[in-house]
Design a protein with these regions (language model features):
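Alpha/beta enzyme core
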Residues: 14-20, 35-60, 68-84, 92-213
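N-terminal amphipathic alpha-helix/helix-capping segment at the start of soluble metabolic enzymes
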Residues: 9-29
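Short, Lys/Arg-enriched N-terminal segments with co-localized hydrophobic residues
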Residues: 1-9
Length: 213
Protein backbone atom coordinates (compact mmCIF):
# COMPACT_ATOMS: atom_id res chain seq x y z
CA UNK A 1 0.00 0.00 0.00
CA UNK A 2 0.96 3.68 0.01
CA UNK A 3 4.20 4.20 1.92
CA UNK A 4 4.19 6.86 4.63
CA UNK A 5 7.68 8.15 5.27
CA UNK A 6 8.79 9.10 8.76
CA UNK A 7 5.93 7.21 10.43
CA UNK A 8 3.73 10.32 10.48
CA UNK A 9 0.70 10.84 8.29
CA UNK A 10 -2.36 12.99 7.89
CA UNK A 11 -5.66 11.72 6.56
CA UNK A 12 -5.32 10.36 3.03
CA UNK A 13 -7.68 10.14 0.06
CA UNK A 14 -9.46 6.85 -0.47
CA UNK A 15 -8.95 7.00 -4.24
CA UNK A 16 -5.23 6.28 -4.40
CA UNK A 17 -5.60 3.75 -1.61
CA UNK A 18 -8.37 1.75 -3.29
CA UNK A 19 -6.77 1.93 -6.72
CA UNK A 20 -3.62 0.47 -5.17
CA UNK A 21 -5.71 -2.22 -3.47
CA UNK A 22 -7.40 -3.08 -6.76
CA UNK A 23 -4.08 -3.23 -8.60
CA UNK A 24 -2.40 -5.41 -6.00
CA UNK A 25 -5.31 -7.66 -5.07
CA UNK A 26 -6.14 -6.76 -1.49
CA UNK A 27 -9.12 -5.26 0.33
CA UNK A 28 -9.24 -2.29 2.69
CA UNK A 29 -11.45 -2.53 5.76
CA UNK A 30 -13.92 0.26 6.53
CA UNK A 31 -15.26 0.64 10.07
CA UNK A 32 -17.99 2.83 11.51
CA UNK A 33 -16.65 4.80 14.49
CA UNK A 34 -18.89 6.63 16.93
CA UNK A 35 -16.57 7.81 19.70
CA UNK A 36 -12.92 8.31 20.64
CA UNK A 37 -12.51 4.80 22.03
CA UNK A 38 -13.70 3.22 18.78
CA UNK A 39 -11.32 5.41 16.77
CA UNK A 40 -8.40 4.41 18.98
CA UNK A 41 -9.30 0.71 18.85
CA UNK A 42 -9.66 0.56 15.06
CA UNK A 43 -6.37 2.36 14.46
CA UNK A 44 -4.59 0.16 17.01
CA UNK A 45 -5.83 -2.96 15.19
CA UNK A 46 -4.83 -1.52 11.81
CA UNK A 47 -1.34 -0.75 13.10
CA UNK A 48 -1.01 -4.24 14.57
CA UNK A 49 -1.87 -5.71 11.17
CA UNK A 50 0.15 -3.06 9.29
CA UNK A 51 -2.95 -2.32 7.22
CA UNK A 52 -4.45 0.87 5.81
CA UNK A 53 -7.89 1.62 7.22
CA UNK A 54 -11.03 3.59 6.40
CA UNK A 55 -12.79 5.28 9.32
CA UNK A 56 -16.37 6.19 8.59
CA UNK A 57 -19.37 7.89 10.14
CA UNK A 58 -23.02 7.32 9.25
CA UNK A 59 -25.95 9.74 9.03
CA UNK A 60 -27.31 8.59 12.41
CA UNK A 61 -23.93 9.15 14.06
CA UNK A 62 -23.87 12.69 12.70
CA UNK A 63 -27.28 13.38 14.24
CA UNK A 64 -25.78 13.61 17.72
CA UNK A 65 -22.34 15.02 16.92
CA UNK A 66 -21.39 17.17 13.95
CA UNK A 67 -19.07 16.14 11.12
CA UNK A 68 -16.49 18.65 12.39
CA UNK A 69 -16.29 16.80 15.71
CA UNK A 70 -15.64 13.40 14.14
CA UNK A 71 -13.23 14.84 11.59
CA UNK A 72 -11.15 16.42 14.37
CA UNK A 73 -11.18 13.18 16.35
CA UNK A 74 -10.02 10.99 13.48
CA UNK A 75 -7.58 13.57 12.08
CA UNK A 76 -5.86 13.81 15.45
CA UNK A 77 -5.52 10.03 15.64
CA UNK A 78 -4.31 9.83 12.03
CA UNK A 79 -1.43 12.21 12.77
CA UNK A 80 -0.07 9.67 15.24
CA UNK A 81 -0.82 6.56 13.19
CA UNK A 82 1.85 4.71 11.22
CA UNK A 83 -0.65 3.43 8.64
CA UNK A 84 -2.74 5.35 6.07
CA UNK A 85 -6.10 6.52 7.45
CA UNK A 86 -9.11 7.68 5.40
CA UNK A 87 -12.03 9.71 6.80
CA UNK A 88 -15.19 8.63 4.99
CA UNK A 89 -18.88 9.52 5.07
CA UNK A 90 -20.77 6.23 4.89
CA UNK A 91 -24.22 6.06 3.28
CA UNK A 92 -24.61 9.81 2.92
CA UNK A 93 -28.37 10.27 2.78
CA UNK A 94 -28.58 13.65 1.06
CA UNK A 95 -26.61 16.20 -0.94
CA UNK A 96 -26.69 18.50 2.09
CA UNK A 97 -25.15 15.91 4.42
CA UNK A 98 -22.50 15.04 1.84
CA UNK A 99 -21.55 18.71 1.60
CA UNK A 100 -21.42 19.04 5.39
CA UNK A 101 -18.86 16.20 5.55
CA UNK A 102 -17.02 17.61 2.53
CA UNK A 103 -16.70 21.04 4.15
CA UNK A 104 -15.59 19.47 7.43
CA UNK A 105 -12.59 17.96 5.64
CA UNK A 106 -13.59 14.34 5.05
CA UNK A 107 -11.25 12.75 2.51
CA UNK A 108 -13.91 10.47 1.00
CA UNK A 109 -17.67 10.88 0.52
CA UNK A 110 -20.44 8.36 -0.13
CA UNK A 111 -23.79 9.43 -1.47
CA UNK A 112 -26.32 6.61 -1.24
CA UNK A 113 -29.16 7.08 -3.70
CA UNK A 114 -29.87 3.36 -3.95
CA UNK A 115 -33.32 3.77 -2.39
CA UNK A 116 -34.30 6.05 -5.29
CA UNK A 117 -35.11 5.07 -8.87
CA UNK A 118 -32.20 4.70 -11.28
CA UNK A 119 -32.37 8.17 -12.88
CA UNK A 120 -32.74 9.92 -9.51
CA UNK A 121 -29.79 7.96 -8.15
CA UNK A 122 -27.71 9.13 -11.12
CA UNK A 123 -28.79 12.75 -10.63
CA UNK A 124 -27.96 13.02 -6.93
CA UNK A 125 -24.72 11.08 -7.35
CA UNK A 126 -23.54 13.31 -10.19
CA UNK A 127 -24.36 16.44 -8.17
CA UNK A 128 -22.08 15.24 -5.36
CA UNK A 129 -19.36 14.19 -7.81
CA UNK A 130 -19.47 17.61 -9.48
CA UNK A 131 -19.10 19.32 -6.09
CA UNK A 132 -16.33 17.09 -4.72
CA UNK A 133 -14.08 16.39 -7.70
CA UNK A 134 -12.77 19.97 -8.15
CA UNK A 135 -11.30 19.59 -4.63
CA UNK A 136 -9.94 16.10 -5.48
CA UNK A 137 -12.27 14.40 -2.99
CA UNK A 138 -13.43 10.99 -4.30
CA UNK A 139 -17.05 9.85 -4.23
CA UNK A 140 -18.62 6.45 -3.64
CA UNK A 141 -22.16 5.56 -4.72
CA UNK A 142 -24.42 2.53 -4.36
CA UNK A 143 -26.48 0.69 -6.96
CA UNK A 144 -28.85 -2.04 -5.85
CA UNK A 145 -29.88 -2.51 -2.24
CA UNK A 146 -27.71 -4.19 0.37
CA UNK A 147 -29.81 -6.36 2.68
CA UNK A 148 -30.01 -6.26 6.47
CA UNK A 149 -30.29 -3.28 8.78
CA UNK A 150 -27.35 -0.89 8.90
CA UNK A 151 -27.34 2.45 10.67
CA UNK A 152 -31.02 3.51 10.86
CA UNK A 153 -31.87 2.21 7.39
CA UNK A 154 -33.53 -1.12 6.64
CA UNK A 155 -32.42 -2.61 3.34
CA UNK A 156 -35.04 -5.35 3.38
CA UNK A 157 -34.24 -8.44 1.35
CA UNK A 158 -31.93 -6.54 -0.97
CA UNK A 159 -32.08 -5.96 -4.73
CA UNK A 160 -29.16 -7.21 -6.80
CA UNK A 161 -27.03 -4.85 -8.88
CA UNK A 162 -27.52 -5.27 -12.63
CA UNK A 163 -24.16 -5.31 -14.48
CA UNK A 164 -25.43 -3.32 -17.47
CA UNK A 165 -26.94 -0.67 -15.20
CA UNK A 166 -23.70 -0.54 -13.23
CA UNK A 167 -21.71 0.23 -16.37
CA UNK A 168 -24.15 2.98 -17.41
CA UNK A 169 -24.26 4.41 -13.89
CA UNK A 170 -20.48 4.71 -13.63
CA UNK A 171 -20.17 6.27 -17.09
CA UNK A 172 -22.89 8.87 -16.49
CA UNK A 173 -21.90 9.89 -12.95
CA UNK A 174 -18.09 9.75 -13.02
CA UNK A 175 -18.17 8.18 -9.56
CA UNK A 176 -14.88 6.82 -8.17
CA UNK A 177 -16.11 3.66 -6.40
CA UNK A 178 -19.31 1.65 -6.59
CA UNK A 179 -20.97 -0.28 -3.77
CA UNK A 180 -22.76 -3.25 -5.32
CA UNK A 181 -25.42 -5.63 -4.04
CA UNK A 182 -24.58 -9.28 -4.69
CA UNK A 183 -26.39 -10.78 -1.70
CA UNK A 184 -24.31 -8.98 0.89
CA UNK A 185 -26.06 -8.01 4.11
CA UNK A 186 -24.84 -5.50 6.69
CA UNK A 187 -25.61 -5.12 10.36
CA UNK A 188 -28.59 -7.12 11.68
CA UNK A 189 -30.15 -9.54 9.20
CA UNK A 190 -32.16 -12.76 9.08
CA UNK A 191 -30.77 -15.97 7.66
CA UNK A 192 -27.38 -16.56 6.07
CA UNK A 193 -26.45 -14.26 3.15
CA UNK A 194 -25.67 -16.04 -0.12
CA UNK A 195 -23.17 -14.17 -2.25
CA UNK A 196 -23.66 -14.17 -6.02
CA UNK A 197 -20.01 -14.25 -7.02
CA UNK A 198 -20.89 -14.84 -10.67
CA UNK A 199 -22.78 -11.54 -10.66
CA UNK A 200 -19.77 -9.86 -9.07
CA UNK A 201 -17.56 -11.21 -11.86
CA UNK A 202 -19.98 -9.89 -14.50
CA UNK A 203 -19.97 -6.44 -12.89
CA UNK A 204 -16.18 -6.51 -12.74
CA UNK A 205 -16.01 -7.17 -16.49
CA UNK A 206 -17.88 -3.95 -17.34
CA UNK A 207 -16.86 -1.65 -14.48
CA UNK A 208 -13.21 -0.66 -14.10
CA UNK A 209 -13.40 1.35 -10.87
CA UNK A 210 -12.94 -0.23 -7.41
CA UNK A 211 -16.00 -2.07 -6.08
CA UNK A 212 -17.24 -1.89 -2.49
CA UNK A 213 -19.00 -4.75 -0.67
Amino acid sequence: YITIEGGLTMLVSSKELLLDAQKNGYAVGAFNVENMEMVQAVIAAAEELNSPVIMQTTPSTLKYADADYFYANVACAAKKANVPVVMHLDHGSSFELAMKAFRAGYTSIMIDGSHSIFEENIAITKSVVDACHPAFVPVEAELGKVGGKEDDLDGGAGGYTDPAEAAEFVERTGVDFLAVAIGTAHGVYKGIPKLDLDRLSEIRKVVSIPLVL
